[in-house]
Regions:
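Acidic, low-complexity, intrinsically disordered interaction modules
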Residues: 22-77
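N-terminal acidic leader/helix
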Residues: 2-35
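Short acidic DE-rich linear segments
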Residues: 78-83
């Protein structure tokens, strides 16, 4: 499975599988219709990163470049078969 390296003081390895499953569980818990998952993930990626990092006890810093976020969204959409 893909590992995305997020820049912080040092690089944090983010498992696309773990993060995708975390998002999937959040969407299921909130009863978001599956046909809107793609847009919801794209629109709320910062929210999901923040929630995931809090759960992992990692300090969240929202200063991640847009290209990296696009790569992360694409990887999540692919993992969840939303493309």
């Amino acid at each position: 499975m893909d590992i995305i390296k997020l820049p912080y003081t040092s690089y944090l390895d983010l498992s696309v599988k773990d993060f995708s499953e975390f998002i999937q569980n959040e969407l299921l818990k909130e009863k978001v219709p599956r046909d809107s998952w793609h847009d919801d993930i794209g629109d709320n990626i910062y929210y999901y990163l923040e929630r995931y990092f809090i759960k992992q006890d990692i300090k969240y810093d929202e200063h991640i470049n847009d290209e990296l976020l696009d790569l992360l969204c694409d990887s999540i959409w692919e993992y969840l078969n939303l493309l």
